[in-house]
Amino acid sequence: MTAIIDIHAREILDSRGNPTVEVDVLLEDGSFGRAAVPSGASTGAHEAVELRDGDKARYLGKGVTKAVTAVNSDIAECILGLDAEDQRDIDLAMIELDGTENKSRLGANAILGTSLAVAKAAADARGLPLYSYVGGVSAHVLPVPMMNIINGGEHADNPIDFQEFMIMPVGAPSLAEAVRWGAEVFHTLKKGLHEKGLATAVGDEGGFAPNLASTRDALDFVMASIEKAGFKPGEDMMLALDCAATEFFKNGKYEISGEGLSLSPDAMADYLAALCDAYPIISIEDGMGEDDFEGWAALTAKVGKRVQLVGDDLFVTNPKRLEMGIGKGLANSLLVKVNQIGSLTETLEAVSIAQRNGYTAVMSHRSGETEDATIADLAVATNCGQIKTGSLARSDRLAKYNQLIRIEEELGVSARYAGKTAFGRLGA
């Protein structure tokens, strides 16, 4: 009854107006699943390959008809008739069919869209929400949001080199209240920027990209907004950074050009440690370049016992990269982006490896998103306790927050907001 009888992919647009892949899966009993694939702006060199057409005459080379064709032909032929509840077998069959280390033949976008649509169809067949189908009875922890309210780096045209300045409402009693707190800080920040004559247009992820002078200038604005909104920094709200340091790691130096700094890996670790001393920063993502293992080791040694150090470009949601990093003692947390690895099975494996080794996990969106809210369900399914899905603007970001609000309501008395427990042994 849960055999796959039809698969259909199409080209749709993401939140940046670029093409992406959407896949529909239909089962014998009429159950249905649909999934759309996100896309990143700052991508790690070790990510699985997002297959693009390269035809400059169409969508400026960013079309995905090759990936769509791969789903509708090769992948469909491979998995039609298989049982949608055999997720691992289906994912492994697609990976084997692709035959490359980085999914470059069929495309991670083709494989992932199919993988997630299969899971949704199987959940529909069981009459279960996706978080419950994937996570079982233990799926009841609502994640603390990392809300990206000021943008720099690759996400903005301003002098700030760090990519994201985020707030985390760790003191909220529930997910719904956490969203409210975040929204109130967001609107307070907007008012404060406007009063200073600074830009309040929003970027790809819904955050502001004002022309601020430095990292500390941005952090000061965020701190002031938290306080003006009536919350206590360090108690109600913690701060989080995504440095995206790979983007400004040049010839062995961290070129923080907006501040006129050229730092060695050790000096960069000291720079970040000083920020953690001055502000209530609980999490730093990609504080070092993706292959600067010595820098990561230095940063982990300096602040790893008190700050969550999240590997995004470092680990690219890849179980092999993650195991390498764990073995070297790099970072203490995994950023989870389903399209970095390209299948649900491998994503769940990476989260499991992280959690078994005492690393936290943070479910994450990409800068190019759609209305698909799958990652909200996966955050609850994996009990990872944290989610990074943008600011409090743009419906492609709010779709995830709204889905989490629904899940919390649906879980009722069994729902638990992770709050200050989200950081494992670090605490907040």
From Swiss-Prot:
Keywords: Cytoplasm, Glycolysis, Lyase, Magnesium, Metal-binding, Secreted
EC number in record: 4.2.1.11
UniProt pathway: Carbohydrate degradation; glycolysis; pyruvate from D-glyceraldehyde 3-phosphate: step 4/5
UniProt-listed InterPro entries: Enolase, Enolase-like_C_sf, Enolase-like_N, Enolase_C, Enolase_CS, Enolase_N
Highest taxon of source: Bacteria
SMART domains given in the database record: Enolase_C, Enolase_N
GO CC annotation: cell surface; extracellular region; phosphopyruvate hydratase complex
Active site positions: E205, K337
Binding site for (2R)-2-phosphoglycerate: Q163, K337, R366, S367, K388
Compartments in which it is found: Cytoplasm; Secreted; Cell surface
Main localization (coarse): cytoplasm
GO molecular function: magnesium ion binding; phosphopyruvate hydratase activity
Enzyme superclass (EC): lyase
Residues annotated to bind Mg(2+): D242, E285, D312
Cofactor(s) the record lists: Mg(2+)
Cofactor note: Binds a second Mg(2+) ion via substrate during catalysis.
PROSITE patterns from the UniProt entry: ENOLASE
Enzymatic reactions: (2R)-2-phosphoglycerate = phosphoenolpyruvate + H2O
Gene Ontology annotations of biological process type: glycolytic process
Annotated function: Catalyzes the reversible conversion of 2-phosphoglycerate (2-PG) into phosphoenolpyruvate (PEP). It is essential for the degradation of carbohydrates via glycolysis.
UniProt cross-references to PANTHER family, sorted A to Z: ENOLASE (PTHR11902:SF1)
Family, as annotated: Belongs to the enolase family.
Entry protein name: Enolase
Annotated source species: Novosphingobium aromaticivorans (strain ATCC 700278 / DSM 12444 / CCUG 56034 / CIP 105152 / NBRC 16084 / F199)
